A protein has these predicted regions:
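Alpha/beta-hydrolase-fold serine-hydrolase catalytic core, especially in secreted/extracellular enzymes
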Residues: 147, 156-158, 164-210
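Acidic catalytic loop of the alpha/beta-hydrolase fold
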Residues: 128-132, 159-160
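The conserved beta1-alpha1 loop
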Residues: 1-4, 102, 125-126
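Short alpha-helix in the alpha/beta-hydrolase fold that links the catalytic acid
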Residues: 132-143
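A conserved short beta-strand
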Residues: 94-105
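Short substrate-entry loop that stabilizes the transition state in hydrolases
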Residues: 1-38, 130-133
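Gly/Ser-rich "nucleophile elbow"/oxyanion-hole loop immediately N-terminal to the catalytic nucleophile
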Residues: 38-83, 201
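Short beta-strand/loop motif that positions the catalytic acidic residue
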Residues: 117, 123-125, 129
Length: 210
């Protein structure tokens, strides 16, 4: 998981813990937290997180020994971290599903990286997001994608509503934080369960009835 610009990983704690309760090992890098982050370096750190899990899975003395499904990695992130998770997924075939939150354009371009991704993509966005508007970010990423893709837009959802608390330069929405986080967790869990656990009962939860 990649954090947003100038945000602490701890502001996503409840969502990361939610995923853990559904059987996922969740790892989040706290790098590139300053005012001049390098997005490619952030993507590289996301990939290093996967390598760390692989290494721990192979060490007999590790608490993770033999516990990690190293062929079933998913990637996620919020804002800058969402964009960097796109870069990481486009560059690392170990990632089998991508689901991010209000992903922001990056340098190098996350939008331009979308055609290189060949795994399922979920671009969760908020209709009231004034920091990373869905029309110029999530929609552009969706349009550029050639993979199975979905763009769930949380009505009334806002940029900082994906976090446990407001951080630097936050906006506001028309739904509560609790409502937005509940819907975010529902979407994330259903998507990852479908594509990483192959739980076909989640098909309609992700794609609807058609």
């Amino acid at each position: 998981f990649g954090h947003g610009f100038f945000q602490q990983v701890s502001t996503y704690q409840s969502t990361l813990e939610h995923l853990a309760t559904h059987g996922y090992f969740v790892i989040a890098t706290d790098s590139e937290g300053g005012l001049a982050p390098n997005h490619q370096n952030f993507a590289d750190d996301i990939k290093r997180c996967l390598t760390y899990l692989e290494q721990e899975n192979a060490i007999s003395s590790s608490v993770l020994f033999g516990q990690v499904a190293v062929n079933k990695y998913g990637a996620s992130g919020h804002s800058m971290g969402g964009g960097s998770s796109i870069l990481a997924t486009s560059q690392d075939s170990r990632i089998k599903a991508l689901a991010n939150l209000a992903a922001a354009e990056t340098n190098p371009s996350a939008i331009s990286a979308m055609p290189a991704i060949n795994v399922p993509v979920q671009l969760i966005s908020g209709s009231a997001d004034t920091i990373v508007p869905v029309g110029t970010n999530g929609q552009a990423m969706f349009n550029a994608s050639v993979s199975p893709k979905i763009l769930p837009v949380i009505q009334g959802g806002w940029h900082c509503g994906f976090q446990d608390a407001n951080g630097f330069g936050c906006d506001n929405g028309t739904i509560t934080r609790a409502q937005q986080l509940a819907e975010t967790r529902r979407l994330l869990t259903a998507f990852f369960d479908l594509y990483l656990k192959r739980s076909e009962t989640n098909w309609k939860k992700v794609w609807g009835n058609d």
